[in-house]
C-alpha cells in the first residue's frame, strides 16, 4: 500500500483490508479477459456482468469502489494510478476508468460501466462514522460529565451532564439506526470566542463530518446540505426566530427523513436522517416564549474564564479527549441502558431552567392588560389581534395560533384567570361567527364571605361619631 492509502483514516484502511481479504484471488487482465462473455464476432460483450467481473477481479479495482452510507456517494478508497484530489468518484475518474476498460478489455459502454460501478460499490458499502465509533476503546475514565466544563467552563451539575449525554446518545443512535426519532438540540450559550462552534466541530470526529452551512430552512437545497454530515451547527437560529419560524424549526428538528432525488437519479428516495443539530448563540434570551413547550432545546451556559483549557490551545489533545468521550458513550450505547429523552424529574428542571433563557413575552402582557379593562363577556382571536395588539390587517394563521396559545396556556404557563374557551362558534357584530373565550365566574370564597372578629378588634374599628 502506498502513501495515498496510508493517508486514509485508520478505520477506513482496516475496512478496505477486510474487504479485500474476503474477495476472490486477483487475476491479470489477460486471465480475466478469457472469462468474459463474448460476441458472435469474437469481441467482448458490452454487458453489466462483464464489467462487474472486471471490477471484482482486476487487482487495480478490487476493493477500490465503495458506497459511503453517510454521504450516499461512491468513494475510491485506494490508489488507481492517476492523481486524485477527492475520495469521491468524480467525472475525471470516470474518464480514466472508461479508458482503462476500453484499452484492456474492449468494454466501451459508459452506461453499462456506470451500472456495474453502482452494483460493486453497493456490495462493498461501508459507513465511516460507524467504523470510527466501533474502532474506539474506552480507557475507563469518565469524561462526558466534565467535558463542557473542561473546555467551555460550563457547570458540572447533573443537568449539564445529562444534556450532553443525551446529545451524544442521539448522535450515535442516528448513525447506527438512521431515521431514529431524536428531536433534541444542545444549545451552547455564551460570548464570542468561547469555543462553542469549535466544540461541535471537534465533536464530529472528522471535519468533513461537520457542517455549519445550514443557513435557511426554506432553502430548496437544505436537505442536500444534511447529506454526508453527522454534527450540524446552527448559529443564532433560534435567537432570531419569530413565532412563525420557531414552528418551522421545531417541525424541521422533528423530521426523521427527507424525500428527494439527487442529480442524475431517476426516482426520489427516502433519506433517513443520520445527523443531529447543535445550536450556538451569544444571546442569553435566545428562546422564544413558546407556550407549547421548548423541550427540544437544551440550553447550557458556558463561561470560558472558568474553563480548564481552551479547546484550541492544543487541538490534538482536545481531539483525543473527545475521542475518549465517544468511546465512553459507545460503552453506554452497547449496554442498551439509555433513553433518548429526559426523565420526568429532569424535564421539570428543564422547564424551570429554560425560563432564564426566554425572551420577554410582550404580546401576552398586552392581551392581559386589555382583558383587565375589557367589560364584555366574550372575546375572539381576531378581536384581540386588532384591539389588544393594535394591528389593522388580518392575522396570519400562525399569529392566530399564537393568540390562542396565550389565552389557553396563559402567562408563565397558567390559564388567564377569568376566561375559558367555548366550544361552538358565536356571532360577533364586527367579526362574524368566531370561536373564542367567554368570561367565567371566579370561584366564590369558602363560607359566607364574612370573617369573625374579636370584641377588641371591633372596638378598634368603631367609627368616631
PLM region spans:
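Conserved catalytic/switch belt of AAA+ P-loop NTPases
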Residues: 246-269
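AAA+/SF3 P-loop NTPase mechanochemical coupling elements
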Residues: 222-227, 262-280
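Conserved AAA+/SF3 P-loop NTPase catalytic/coupling segment centered on the Walker-B
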Residues: 231-253, 288-293
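N-terminal nucleic-acid engagement/recognition segments and initiation subdomains in replication
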Residues: 1-142, 158, 162, 393-398, ...
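Conserved nucleotide-binding/hydrolysis micro-motifs of P-loop NTPases
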Residues: 238-239, 282-286, 303-308
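P-loop NTPase catalytic core of nucleic-acid-dependent motor ATPases
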Residues: 117-227, 382, 389
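Positively charged interface segments
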Residues: 217, 265, 291, 304-320, ...
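Phosphate-sensing "switch" segment of ASCE/P-loop ATPases
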Residues: 271-275, 290-369, 373
